[in-house]
From Swiss-Prot:
Keywords: Cytoplasm, Methyltransferase, S-adenosyl-L-methionine, Transferase, tRNA processing. S-adenosyl-L-methionine binds at G113, I133, G134, D135, F136, V137, L138. It catalyses: guanosine(37) in tRNA + S-adenosyl-L-methionine = N(1)-methylguanosine(37) in tRNA + S-adenosyl-L-homocysteine + H(+). It is found in: Cytoplasm. It is an enzyme of class 2 (transferase). Belongs to the RNA methyltransferase TrmD family. It comes from Aliivibrio salmonicida (strain LFI1238) (Vibrio salmonicida (strain LFI1238)). SUPFAM superfamilies: alpha/beta knot. This is tRNA (guanine-N(1)-)-methyltransferase. The lineage of its organism: Bacteria, Pseudomonadati, Pseudomonadota, Gammaproteobacteria, Vibrionales. The gene is trmD. InterPro entries: Alpha/beta_knot_MTases, tRNA_m1G_MeTrfase_C_sf, tRNA_m1G_MeTrfase_TrmD, tRNA_m1G_MTases_N, tRNA_MeTrfase_TRMD/TRM10. Its EC number is 2.1.1.228. Specifically methylates guanosine-37 in various tRNAs. One of its GO terms (molecular function) is tRNA (guanine(37)-N1)-methyltransferase activity.
Length: 249
């Protein structure tokens, strides 16, 4: 996967390129990230990238010319057909389904806004999709872009050592993940559930599904309304709820 990033602060993306799974993916040639700074495309000695909005109001907007030229440069550098994304509070909220959808693209250009945003005509003429990471305000689009890169790259074949890791993550099947345990077997008097030490893979899978359903019911019940549970899942959830009520008495 190739990702081009348009940002006034390209140095921020070193946290993606130099560390963790994404860094390893870059070293393996599975992921490529390039950055373009609109300041490098300005036409004045002050390298101006912002201007006042028509109609007045607080703040400034990113100027059209430097931003458009940066987008053009990124498009031309892309190895193939490219989808251009603007990280925006007005965009579609990113979730696991959206991540998997975006992961089907081989090339992405991500535009990171600053100030009060960008000229609407840039969105109309240059942007294919707008995406948001939530209903809250950030100072720029860099953190959302890094979030998108991190989440999408997990679905690039070979990026994760075990692709099942991505398939079993929280939200991969619409549910929260189940609890996980490692050594020591007993910690502060709390033991690892015996089923996980049994070696019975069928029982372990059943326990994990039950815990996943139960955790979703406890913490994000609205997610269950979007799922068509199997008969077995319905039974496991009912069993979890019953046990939870018994423990709370």
């Amino acid at each position: 996967m190739w990702v081009g990033v348009i940002s006034l602060f390209p140095e921020m993306f070193r946290s993606v390129t130099d560390f963790g799974v994404t860094s390893q993916a870059i070293k393996k040639g599975l992921l490529s990230i390039e950055t373009w700074n609109p300041r490098d495309f300005t036409q004045d000695k002050h390298r101006t990238v912002d201007d006042r909005p028509y109609g007045g109001g607080p703040g400034m907007l990113m100027m059209v010319q430097p931003l458009r030229d940066a987008i053009t440069a990124a498009r031309e550098a892309a190895p193939g057909k490219t989808k251009v994304i603007y990280l925006s509070p007005q965009g579609r909220t990113l979730n696991q389904a959206g991540v998997e959808e975006l992961a089907t693209n081989e090339n992405l250009v991500l535009i990171c806004g600053r100030y009060e945003g960008v000229d609407e005509r840039i969105i109309q003429s240059e942007v294919d999709e707008e995406w948001s990471i939530g209903d809250f305000v950030l100072t720029g689009g860099e953190l959302p872009a890094m979030t998108l890169i991190d989440s999408v790259s997990r679905f690039v074949p070979g990026v994760l050592g075990d692709f099942a890791s991505a398939e079993e993550d929280s939200f991969a099947d619409g549910l929260l993940d189940c609890p996980h345990y490692t050594r020591p077997e007993v910690l502060d008097g709390k033991e690892v559930p015996s089923v996980l030490k049994s070696g019975n893979h069928k029982d372990i899978a059943r326990w994990r599904m039950k815990q996943s359903l139960g955790r979703t019911w406890l913490r994000r019940p609205e997610l269950l309304g979007n799922l068509a549970l199997t008969d077995e899942q319905e039974l496991l959830l009912a069993e979890f709820v019953r046990e939870e009520h018994q423990q709370s008495k």
